Amino acid sequence: MGRVVGIDLGTTNSVIAVMEGGKPMVIANAEGVRTTPSVVGVSKTGERLVGELARRQLVLNPRNTFANIKRFIGRRYDELTDESKRVPYTVRRDPEGNVRIVCPQLSREFAPEEVAAMILRKLAEEASRYLGEPVTGAVITVPAYFNDSQRQATRDAGRIAGLEVKRILNEPTAASLAYGLDRRDNQTILVFDLGGGTFDVSVLEVGNGVFEVKATSGDTQLGGNDFDRRIVDWLAEQFLEAEGIDLRRDRQALQRLIEAAEKAKIELSGVSVTDINLPFITATEDEPKHLETRLTRSEFEALCEDLLERMMRPLRRALKDARLQPQDIDEVVLVGGSTRMPMVQQLVRSLIGREPNQNVNPDEVVAIGAAIQAGILAGEVKDILLLDVTPLSLGLETIGGVMKKLIPRNTAIPVRRSDIFSTAENNQTMVEIHILQGERQLAEGNKSLGRFKLTGIPPAPRGVPQVQVSFDIDANGILQVSALDKTTGREQTVTIQGASTLSQEEVKRMMKDAELYAQQDRQLKARIEKRNRAQTLIAQSERRLREISLDFGLYFAESKRRRIESTIRELKDYLERQDDRGLDLALAELQDALFDLNQETAARLRDEEGEGFFEPLKQTFASLRGDGNRDFERSWDDRGGDRWDADPWDRSRRSTPSYGYDDRRSPVSDPYRGERWVEEQTSMSRREPVRDRNGGNGSVRPEPAPRRGRPTWEEDQPPRRDRSSQPPAKPASGRRWNDGWDDDDDEWF
């Protein structure tokens, strides 16, 4: 069974965490960063990119790079604001009124759930790589103010990514889990969550392992990106006044403005003024145009006054629903990177009257809480009870277009509520149930989650039939509605999908497409890695050949060097032709050839360590002879002689007595063996004289050595081990070599 992880699917960045050893831990991605940009792109070659790689092509390829997808999940096209639709890529409406993302590179459209699924799959693969085992389940966080269709769309995204979504968890609730896990005292916590695209406020009571949500509120169309857009509009208006060009009409210029605005917002959190320089932002027929300006913190805060007012309303509503006063709050936990802005922190101080707690990492705390919830579901974390609430009221439409609420907002979940309804006309045999979510009194002002019909009602006067409608919300916040005719017992149950979410058939099709594309991506990745390995091996082989040439000379292992050079040429040719099969064969051949060369190099190094000073002389002699190195090493022994031939200086192996060599005058007994001096064979005592025919008095000359068949002195010398071109050493001057029969030239005793 695979692991269950916690995932914070954010508008700007996403984070994944897991329980390890009873403690939550954030997993870094392949780039070594703990947060992954929530960006998906398609390169010009058709490769799908997720995360930092996709973010890098935002400026150069804006139409095929998709960011801020979370704002489109589970929403109809008519529900989007103009600011939400102002993105560098194309967002269109499909025939059903849902949102579709256009990808010109692939000539197809994506649902927001599909794009979100690519991000989730990327995070799951990173976790699998780190853990060494597959990730099959996940707890995914959503803003607390997400409605039912948005939650269902998030669940669909997880299914498309191949994950079993164990729980849909509210982000403020997850943050409270991470904050209060080790706390045993009772506290009232206010979680202020300002992310990239959403804003939530939740009030919780934490103590003794119980996390009870008292109230929640928020705005799903308010986040840090809205602060960026204020800077973008300010820059664009300034440039329009100065140059008469609206940069917002140029996709690349707009993306550069967005990146510059985000950078300026981050810098203004630490400094009071920042410079914005965008050279070559656009060009006219005459010259290129540059954008250079300066933005102060006070100017930035003045641009965002209305956004701060929008944050005050959910904050006050959450306190009111929890029936608490600001002084009743014990701790304020800031969640989301946008809470680092000084004006946001000052807003919290002014409304709550308490300094915000900044001990937690606002970028990672939600994912850590999701991992804790995953540990609770897996049984790794015990003695933790989480009581969440539904963020919005649920009900149905009645006569006159009025909404009848069955489950008020901030009701603890899971929950089941029922009510009895009747027909509006005489002899009515069918009832249509219209499910709504929201806080407005009239049905048209609320979110429509879906409709279904209950048929087979017996004809009866108006108001006589009794239809029991039940709303059931599970721990994930997913709504299930059932209608029961109490007269006939006929019942119909439906899980609300939401008008803007995908059908089951579409989800299954997208799951197959995602798996197919994932397989194609794996194959493409393997192909790229193979080419990288080939290029790396080529560079290593060429460097190795250069090193061996410098260390051992150009003639060392010449055949193996030629084999490697030939294989390198073949490998480069296969790389140029993109021949994968030939590439595999050439890679294996080059690896084998390089291994053989390294083996011979290692053997030569071992021999050099044993032979020391004489090895360079041996190499010189071998190069003069033109012999192969290995044959040369095999045929020469440690004494410098041929190990396959008998030692010509070994008298015990000669069949013909050697009489020509006179050693009786010297106290040294034949110390020369090859060119070396052998100390152990040196004796200071004279040899016994050769017995003569005169009774051993030494007056009779010995038998001379026969001339025929006797080699000359130079021919009888063994080859020199040091490969020197100098003539071999001659015997000591006190000795004579009986070279002939001339008695006048010979010396006798």
Swiss-Prot record:
Pfam families: HSP70. The keyword Nucleotide-binding applies. Keywords: ATP-binding, Chaperone, Nucleotide-binding, Phosphoprotein, Stress response. It comes from the Bacteria. Induction: By stress conditions e.g. heat shock. Acts as a chaperone. This is Chaperone protein DnaK 1. It comes from Synechococcus sp. (strain ATCC 27144 / PCC 6301 / SAUG 1402/1) (Anacystis nidulans). The lineage of its organism: Bacteria, Bacillati, Cyanobacteriota, Cyanophyceae, Synechococcales.
